[in-house]
Amino acid sequence: FLAKKVAKKLVSHVAQKQME
């Protein structure tokens, strides 16, 4: 499902923001 790919991208984006 596409939503899973989008969710993974969102999680990666949030994780990167919290790392900074």
UniProtKB/Swiss-Prot annotation:
Keywords tagged on the record: Amidation, Secreted, Toxin
Tissue specificity: Expressed by the venom gland.
Location of this chain's protein in the cell: Secreted
Modified-residue entries (Glutamic acid 1-amide), positions: 20
Gene Ontology molecular-function annotations: toxin activity
GO terms of biological process kind: defense response to bacterium
Assigned GO CC terms: extracellular region
InterPro entries tied to this protein: Cupiennin (IPR035164)
Family: Belongs to the cationic peptide 04 (cupiennin) family. 04 subfamily.
Protein name: Short cationic peptide-4c
Organism from which the protein derives: Cupiennius salei (American wandering spider)
